[in-house]
Curated annotation (Swiss-Prot):
InterPro entries: AA_transpt_TM. Belongs to the amino acid/polyamine transporter 2 family. SLC38A9 subfamily. Pfam families: Aa_trans (PF01490). Residues 1-118, 167-197, 300-308, 377-393, 458-478, 528-539 are cytoplasmic. Residues 128-133 are annotated as: Important for arginine binding and amino acid transport. Lysosomal amino acid transporter involved in the activation of mTORC1 in response to amino acid levels. Probably acts as an amino acid sensor of the Rag GTPases and Ragulator complexes, 2 complexes involved in amino acid sensing and activation of mTORC1, a signaling complex promoting cell growth in response to growth factors, energy levels, and amino acids. Following activation by amino acids, the Ragulator and Rag GTPases function as a scaffold recruiting mTORC1 to lysosomes where it is in turn activated. Glycans are attached at N238, N247, N265, N273. It comes from Mus musculus (Mouse). This is Neutral amino acid transporter 9. It catalyses: L-leucine(in) = L-leucine(out); L-tyrosine(in) = L-tyrosine(out); L-glutamine(out) = L-glutamine(in); L-asparagine(out) = L-asparagine(in).
Length: 560
C-alpha cells in the first residue's frame, strides 16, 4: 500500500487561482472527510466556475478505484469499513459530481454544516411549503366558517411546527450511531426497522403522487381557461353572460351554481347555434379532452434521466406566489369587504362562523404545512446550526401569515350579495372569468411553473420507488415508462372524473400527514424518552393525543 506521503500528492494539476469563489462553489465541513466519496471525472468535464480546464492524474483515477473498493465492502450507513483517511483526498482536492456531467470544486469552511444564512434558510422553507394548497385555502375557510377557519389555520400551524421540531430533534435522540448524514427515513428505520423504512417510503410516495395528481388537474384547468380566453378574445365572446356573476367592472362568477358542486364545462351554452363555438366546445373541454392533450407534452419529459434542466425554473414558484398575493390584494381593494357574522345559522348569502366541515380545512392544511420529510435536508445547509429552531419557527410564522392573508382577503372580498359565499371554488381562480386579464396572467404563470415542476416530482417518485425496489433509479426505459404511465393515468383519471383539487389535497394531506406529521415524530419522541427513563405521564398523554388527532383527521375526511 502506498505511504501516507505518497498518497498526499496532488490529484489535479495546478490551476489558476480563483479571484472570487463564485456562486457554484459548494461548501462542506472539512472535518467530515471520511464520509466523502470522490468520483472519477472525464478530463474534459472537470470545470471550475471560471471554466479553467483541469486534468485528472492517473493517481487520482487509482485512488478512485480504491474508494469504490471500500464502498463495496459494506453498506454506506456502516462506518466499520469506511475508507481510511490516507485514501480520501485532501479538502482542496475534493470535487462533487453534477448530473450535468461537470465537477464543481468544494470549498472548505469551519463555520457550520452549510453555507446558507438564516435569511436564505427561512426563505427556502417558505418557498418549499408554498404549493398548490394556497389555491384551496379560501375554500377551506368557507367550509370551516370564517372565524373557525382562521383559528384552525393558526392552530394547525402551531401543531405542525411542533411536530416538525420533533423531526429536527429526532437525530439527536440516537447516541449509538453517527447520524450526521441521516435523513428522516433513516431515523424511522432505526426505531421501527424495515417497517419504518418502507412505511415512510409509502407515505412519501402518497404525498408525491397526490401532488402530481393535483398538478395534472390544475394544469388541465389552466390550459382550458387559457385556450378559452384566446378563443373568446378572437370571437368577441363575453363568457360572464352564461354564468351567475356580478355586473360590474370587476366581475366575479359562480361557475358551479345549480350544479351541486360538480364542475360545469358548458360555459357557452347560449352560443350553441354557432357552429364554430360548438366545434370548440367539443374539442376543448375541461374534463373530456384537455387532460389528454397534456399527455403528449408531459409524458416525454417524465422519461428524462435527469431533471436538472427543469430545476433552473424553481424561481417561478416564488414569482407565482408573489403575483397571486398582488392579484388578491388588488381584487380586495376593488371589491371591498363583504362580511356578516352568524355563528351557527346560515343565511342566503353568508355561511355560519362555525361549521361541522372544518376537518376538510384541516386536511388541506396538513399538506399545506407539510415539509417534515425534507426539513432535515434543508436545515443541514444552514450556516449557523444553533439557529435551526429559530429559523424554522420564523419560516412557519411567515407561511401561516401568507395563508391567512390569502384566505381572509379572498373570503372577505367575495361579493356577497349578490353571490353567496358558498360559491367560493376549490381553486379560487375559478371565481374569476377566463376573460379577466389578471387571472389570465396568473394562470399562465402557474401553468408554466407546474409544467417545469411536474417532471421533478416524477423524478423524485422514480428515485424513491425504483431506487428502493431495483437499486437503480433508471433500470430501463421500460420500467420508467410503466411507472410514468401509471402516474399520468392517475392524473388524467382524476382530472376527468374528480377534478376537485380541494378534495384531492385534503385526502392526500391527511394520509401522508398521518405518518410524517402526527405518528412518527410523536412515537419516536415517546420511545426515546422511555429509553432514557425520562418519560412522564403528561408528555405521554400529550403525544398520544397528537397521534389520535392525526387518525381522526384522516377518518373525518371520508365522512365530509
Amino acid at each position: 500500500m502506498a505511504s501516507v506521503d505518497g498518497d498526499s500528492r496532488h490529484l489535479l494539476s495546478e490551476v489558476e487561482h480563483e479571484v472570487s469563489p463564485g456562486p457554484m462553489n459548494i461548501q462542506f465541513d472539512s472535518s467530515d472527510l471520511r464520509s466523502k466519496r470522490p468520483f472519477y471525472i472525464e478530463p474534459t468535464n472537470i470545470v471550475n466556475v471560471n471554466d479553467v480546464i483541469q486534468r485528472v492524474s492517473d493517481h487520482a483515477a487509482a485512488m478512485n478505484k480504491r474508494i469504490h473498493y471500500y464502498s463495496r465492502l459494506t453498506t454506506p450507513a456502516d462506518k466499520a469499513l469506511i475508507a481510511p483517511d490516507h485514501v480520501v483526498p485532501a479538502p482542496e482536492e475534493c470535487y462533487v459530481y453534477s448530473p450535468l456531467g461537470s465537477a464543481y470544486k468544494l470549498k472548505s469552511y469551519t463555520e457550520g454544516y452549510g453555507k446558507n444564512t438564516s435569511l436564505v434558510t427561512i426563505f427556502m422553507i417558505w418557498n418549499t411549503m408554498m404549493g398548490t394548497s394556497i389555491l384551496s385555502i379560501p375554500w377551506g375557510i368557507k367550509q370551516a366558517g370564517f372565524t373557525t377557519g382562521m383559528c384552525v389555520i393558526v392552530l394547525m400551524g402551531l401543531l405542525t411546527l411542533y411536530c416538525c421540531y420533533r423531526v429536527v430533534k429526532s437525530r439527536s435522540t440516537i447516541s449509538t450511531s453517527d447520524t450526521s448524514t441521516w435523513e428522516y427515513p433513516d431515523v424511522c428505520k432505526h426505531y421501527f426497522g424495515s417497517f419504518g423504512q418502507w412505511s415512510s417510503l409509502l407515505f412519501s410516495l402518497v404525498s408525491l403522487i397526490g401532488a402530481m395528481i393535483v398538478y395534472w388537474v390544475l394544469m388541465s384547468n389552466f390550459l382550458f381557461n387559457t385556450g378559452k380566453f384566446i378563443f373568446n378574445f378572437i370571437h368577441h365572446i363575453n363568457d360572464t353572460d352564461t354564468v351567475l356573476s356580478t355586473n360590474n367592472s370587476n366581475p366575479v362568477i359562480c361557475p358551479n351554481a345549480g350544479s351541486g358542486g360538480r364542475p360545469d364545462n358548458s360555459s357557452m351554452i347560449f352560443y350553441n347555434n354557432n357552429t364554430e363555438v360548438q366545434l370548440f366546445e367539443k374539442w376543448w373541454d375541461k374534463s373530456r379532452t384537455v387532460p389528454f392533450y397534456l399527455i403528449g407534452l408531459l409524458l416525454p419529459l417524465l422519461n428524462f434521466k435527469s431533471p436538472s434542466f427543469f430545476s433552473k425554473f424553481n424561481i417561478l414558484g416564488t414569482v407565482s406566489v408573489l403575483y397571486l398575493i398582488f392579484v388578491v390584494t388588488l381584487k380586495a381593494v376593488r371589491l371591498g369587504f363583504h362580511l356578516e357574522f352568524h355563528w351557527f345559522v346560515p343565511t342566503e348569502f353568508f355561511v355560519p362562523e362555525i361549521r361541522a366541515q372544518f376537518p376538510q380545512l384541516m386536511g388541506v392544511l396538513t399538506l399545506a404545512f407539510f415539509i417534515h420529510n425534507c426539513i432535515i435536508t434543508l436545515l443541514k445547509n444552514n450556516k449557523n446550526q444553533e439557529n435551526n429552531v429559530r429559523d424554522l419557527c420564523i419560516a412557519y410564522m411567515l407561511v401561516t401569515l401568507t395563508y391567512l392573508y390569502i384566505g381572509i382577503l379572498v373570503f372577505a372580498s367575495f361579493p356577497s350579495p349578490p353571490l353567496p359565499k358558498d360559491c367560493i371554488e376549490q381553486n379560487f381562480l375559478d371565481n374569476f372569468p377566463s376573460s379577466d386579464i389578471l387571472s389570465f396572467i396568473a394562470r399562465i404563470f402557474l401553468l408554466f411553473q407546474m409544467m417545469t415542476v411536474y417532471p421533478l416530482l416524477g423524478y423524485l417518485a422514480r428515485v424513491q420507488l425504483l431506487g428502493h425496489i431495483f437499486g437503480d433509479i433508471y433500470p430501463s426505459i421500460f420500467h420508467v415508462l410503466i411507472l410514468n404511465l401509471v402516474i399520468v393515468g392517475a392524473g388524467v383519471t382524476m382530472a376527468c372524473f374528480y377534478p376537485n383539487i380541494g378534495g384531492i389535497i385534503r385526502y392526500s394531506g391527511a394520509a401522508c400527514g398521518l405518518a410524517f406529521v402526527f405518528i412518527y415524530p410523536s412515537l419516536i419522541y415517546i420511545i426515546s424518552l422511555h429509553q432514557e427513563e425520562r418519560l412522564t405521564w403528561p408528555k405521554l398523554v400529550f403525544h398520544v393525543i397528537i397521534i389520535i388527532l392525526g387518525l381522526a383527521n384522516l377518518i373525518a375526511q371520508f365522512f365530509m
